[in-house]
Amino acid sequence: MSQPVPLFDTYKNFQFLTRHNLDGELPAVLEAFERFSNPTEAMDGYSVVKLFLKSYAANQATFNSYRTHVERLLLWSLLVCRKPILHLRRQDAEAFLEFCLNPPENWVGPVTKSRFVRIGGRRKADSDTFVINPDWRPFNYTVSKATRKLADETDSAMPGIQAYQMSQTTIAQVFTVCGSFYQFCIDEDYTDANPFRAVKQKSRYKQSVVSQVTSRSLTQLQWEFVIEAAEHMAEQEPEFHERTLFILTTLFSMYLRVSDLTGRDNWQPTMGSFKKAGDNWWFHVVGKGNKAAKVSVRDSYLPYLIRYRTTLGLTDLPYPGEQTPLLSSLDGRTGLSGRRIRELIQMVFDAACARMIEEGLQEDCDALRAASLHWLRHTSATLDAPFRDMKDLQADLRHESLSTTQDSYYDSLDDQRASSIKAIPIKGR
């Protein structure tokens, strides 16, 4: 395949797609995968991009913008660079940005009304099929009504792709969105590198205006709904969801990433990963970059640990050197995949959202729909920051730089800074 094709449908139809399988995709999209040189790489890249877009599915305008830019990146990686999207490096990111500034003719066309065309009768029916709109292009130019009318009257061709020019604002959006995509992939443990962060001459692609990063954390109220939903699920179906409650509280209480629960090639978490030193409990992990670390365990987490261990028929608390797997499948197999853990957390989010709707909290539900597992880490750190020393929080988050912790979780210091000057008069002091 050399001609780019649309891979993602409208915002409305995207809402019906599931996160972790391709059951809801249009047949036209599935057929398009088979025409790529490596269909498996195409589907893998598509699946990760879909998860990224799901995290922005609460807002249609944001979704449409992010879909445009990250879909271009996916198509470029497959058709031009011929690399999996998660294997791109700095040079590739720079090449893509230059590509966006000057796309080839077959990637540019006029704005089309639809990405997919319905085939069927005059009225919509379940039997209708959808095919890819052959006029769709990743990059679009607009032609004014006057220009179109003049072309019709003089029987001349309308301006073509030479009319396309990407604005500085748009290329800045490309840079930001693609960088956000790779940060999402890092957070979700799909990759360790963000090629757009490493781009040289960033000023060429970034606006000088500093944009505010959207927070990816739940409010205190939303978190209360989430944990109460998990507790209710555990009470109703303990054989299935005591483990779910344990996973949720473990991720939240210790700011963990999903890989801290699934393990790595050279390390697997066990109950023995909990170790007591004096009066304090610690959870020992091997994190990103194979770095060993320990995370402090709060007292309020221990009842959840005891509760889960009781369902497994274990002693209340772990003993030194215990090799019991931290997590197992319901049929007793050691460990859980990251995909399965995400599915369980999503079940909790869905249950919490349903309860929010019952109580008239539609906006909170809309926000929760955008949440992913990694939001638990951000949520916990955000809620804990006012009560913890910055360096202690940095250590438990395992941030290399203190400034990362400060910039992410101590924005309230700006409020203190602003309020400290509000009441100071210019005269008459």
Feature map (PLM): residue ranges:
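N-terminal core-binding DNA-recognition domain of tyrosine recombinases/integrases
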Residues: 47-64, 71-213, 233-234
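Basic, Lys/Arg- and aromatic-enriched nucleic-acid-binding interface segment
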Residues: 165-168, 225-258
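Short pre-functional
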Residues: 179-183, 242-262, 283, 383
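Conserved tyrosine-mediated DNA breakage-rejoining catalytic core shared by Y-recombinases
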Residues: 263-307, 313
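C-terminal catalytic core of Y-nucleophile DNA break-rejoin enzymes
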Residues: 287-307, 322-348
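Short, basic (Lys/Arg/His-rich) helix/loop patches that form interaction surfaces
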Residues: 342-395, 402-403
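Catalytic-site neighborhood detector that most strongly recognizes the C-terminal catalytic loop/helix
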Residues: 397-422
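C-terminal secondary-structure termini that scaffold catalytic or DNA-interacting sites
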Residues: 423-429
